[in-house]
Amino acid sequence: QTVKEIFDAEKIDMIFNADTIKAYKNDDNTITVTTTKDGDNVTGTHLLLAIGRVPNTDLLGLENTSIEKNNRGFINVNEYCQTNVEGIYAMGDCNGKGAFTHTSYNDYQIVENQLFGEKNRKISDRITTYGLFIDPPLGRVGMTKTEAISNGHKILVAHRPMDKVGRAKEKGETFGFMEAIINAENNQFLGACV
């Protein structure tokens, strides 16, 4: 919803659940796309095609092993980044657990802990994070308010509109807010978003 509000303010239209029938460039350098959504034509100056990510696991020679992949081509791993073949681990983008540098590094930490440590780290212990590199950028770490409440936490919420943040005012980017969610019983940090 937040991304839609940002795009609406920029006069960027989003079309959901539609397949492209055809796309062509017009004489005035605009692009027209015909979609299955009511057969509508959409004309604009730019076209963003977001098709998702595909791992390059087909280049690893896995067909010569018994290592299993899922239907999207990611290598199947358990909570410890172990494949179905004993002693073989899959870390980073190839396991489908998050295509981020910090996630890949955490995969390494889990495997290192399994091989040389206390064997007590696992993927499910990972704190949920994400970032959307749009303008303004969006990001989250940990639980949302809804998740915290549904997990039985009594929460405190610190909320600060961006129009009250000096740096945001200085840059003229005052849309949105920052928020932190804290466990009201023990002051434990549960999550934050911007």
Please provide the spans of the model-predicted regions.
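Helical element adjacent to the flavin cofactor pocket in flavoenzyme catalytic cores
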Residues: 2-14
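Mid-to-C-terminal Rossmann-like scaffold of FAD/NAD(P)H-dependent oxidoreductases
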Residues: 9, 21-22, 56, 94-194
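Conserved beta-strand segments of alpha/beta enzyme cores
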Residues: 13-14, 41, 68, 154-156
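Short loop/edge segments at beta-strand edges and connector loops
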Residues: 16-18, 71, 159
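Conserved beta-strand-loop-beta-strand element in the redox core of flavoprotein oxidoreductases
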Residues: 24-41, 47
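A short, glycine/Asx- and small/polar-enriched loop/turn
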Residues: 25-31, 85, 171-176
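Short acidic-glycine loop/turn motifs at beta-strand connectors
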Residues: 27, 37, 63-64, 71, ...
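FAD-site-proximal beta/loop scaffold in flavoenzymes
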Residues: 41-117
